[in-house]
């Protein structure tokens, strides 16, 4: 695999690795490419029902929702709510090597 530009993000509300996901969608894997509200909300709902959701974000700033209404500690309540139970990775999908991932 050639060198793809990617970076993992720490997601607030993510379950520990060894915690089994329970729910009717357990075993379903979802790739989320949405930003802001609608797509992430739908994916969050799937994750809440047990699906494994992997959010793909552009390198750099990531989803613009990360910066909406920042609190004093630098986090966004919107981001905390919409990203729960998901894993995130930043990939430059214009790069063929990143597309292979």
What are these regions, as identified by a protein language model?
Residues 5-101:
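N-terminal helix-loop segment corresponding to the beta1-alpha1 unit
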């Amino acid at each position: 695999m050639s060198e793809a530009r990617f970076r993992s993000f720490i997601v607030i509300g993510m379950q520990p690795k060894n915690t089994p996901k329970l729910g009717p969608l357990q075993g379903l894997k979802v790739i989320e490419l949405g930003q802001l509200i609608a797509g992430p909300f739908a994916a969050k709902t799937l994750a809440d029902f047990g699906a494994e959701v992997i959010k793909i974000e552009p390198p750099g700033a990531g989803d613009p929702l990360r910066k909406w209404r920042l609190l004093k500690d630098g986090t966004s309540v919107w981001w905390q709510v919409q990203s729960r139970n998901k894993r995130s990775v930043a990939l430059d999908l214009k790069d063929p090597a990143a597309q292979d991932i």
